Amino acid sequence: HLATWYDVFEKAQNQGSELWFYTVGIFQKGSYPNKTVDVPLIESRILHWLNYRFGLKGYLHWGFNSWTDDPFAAPGTHRGDGWHVYPKTDGLINSLRWEQMRNGIQDYEYLWMLEDKIRKSVAGPGERLSIIELSRRGVEIASRIVETMDTYNKSPDTLYEVKKQIINELLDLDIAPQIIVQTNPLEHSTVANDCAIDVFGWAQPGTKVVVNGHSLPLSDDGLFMENVSLSRDNTIVVEAEHEKGKKRIVRSFEVLY
């Protein structure tokens, strides 16, 4: 239902409603990520990448310990959808699915940390916070794992590579020159041939910003904005130079010929 009627739900989000999502175990053969025992384990982790990718605030579990008479041998019609842990005489036994759910929540926290770091970087007087979309970079990165609600990457190697990218970008924001680069459309979007990209962002005062070879002026607040054609390799290359250092930032796009 969320994917089918997402436009309606998104409108409610924009009006201030908090949106969570839910999966049903009996549909585990569908194309959406799930957390039952008979789907790839990484899907339990991907659920929270989907949360960040679409601005959702939570995931509703049908049950934590709603066991069958023998949860070890009889997962039930919903294939373990009603529990993430197993019973023992003196407590609970953890599960791999529960651990991956925890890892997915921690991945979400890394994306939130990146958003918070961007917020702190651009905080101050002027129009910075009205122009910079704080979650935009995290959404771009998360889209490498979750492209749509039913199109997602199940490769653990790719997930770890993307998580490393989040960590590197978090650390990079502490290194001069500080710069936030955003594009419209988002990085990794599919665009028409000869399409121009809106490039905008913020850089710390005194930074020289060059985008695909064109020098851009900065406002008193450090804001910049320009409509730029893609390079031959379908990228936007932003070079930032300051007396304290240099940076080179690349944003890539898919081109439809």
Protein language model annotation of sequence segments:
Residues 56, 71-177:
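Catalytic domains of carbohydrate-active enzymes that cleave complex glycans
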Residues 29-30, 90-93, 188:
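Generic signal for short, ordered secondary-structure residues
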Residues 176-257:
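Ser/Thr-rich low-complexity repeats and stalk/linker segments
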Residues 39-44, 78-86, 229-242:
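Short, structured secondary-structure boundary patches
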Residues 32-34, 71-75, 217, 221-224:
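Short secondary-structure transition/capping segments
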Residues 1-68:
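Catalytic-core regions of glycoside hydrolase
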Residues 70-71, 192:
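Extended hydrophobic-aromatic, low-complexity segments
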